[in-house]
């Protein structure tokens, strides 16, 4: 009798590696590092998903309370700029993937706070691993701004890799 693969094994979905991207050099480094270490030789054990959290125009302008005079004119301009930035971020990430011969990539741009968008996308794709770049903020700046990577490390329901860009020596 011929041996056949277990049908459960052949139909098992490929695990997902999710990489959070933004316009920073730290994000670009984290994506490049991920591609070099997990997606070389045109094969990988993972499906690649990239997510960019696009802030809303109101959060970017800081309009949490009553709208000030002139906001109606400014918000569409800010929103247009944020959409252009998001398109550039997504395109640059896609180009880097293509350069590294990774063509089967999903890129999502989602409006919202980066921490929530990233953790929600982990859940949506049932990611096994989340990769985020480290901006290398000091303790005070991290305490004031909050760290997206720290938040994700504590709230994402998967393994989280924080990729630090090596400091250049002078």
Regions found by a protein language model. Give the residues of each.
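Flexible, glycine-rich phosphate/dinucleotide-binding loops
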Residues: 57-59, 116, 169
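Active-site phosphate/pyrophosphate- and oxyanion-stabilizing loops and adjacent acidic/basic residues
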Residues: 32, 95, 150
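Small/aliphatic-rich secondary-structure junction motif
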Residues: 3-75, 83, 98-105
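Short, surface-exposed alpha-helical segments at coil->helix boundaries
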Residues: 79, 83-91
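Generic structural signal for residues in well-ordered beta-strands
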Residues: 104-107, 160
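Charged docking surfaces used in two-component/phosphorelay signaling
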Residues: 109-117
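Gly/Ser-rich helix-loop-strand patches that form or flank binding pockets
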Residues: 1-7, 120-170
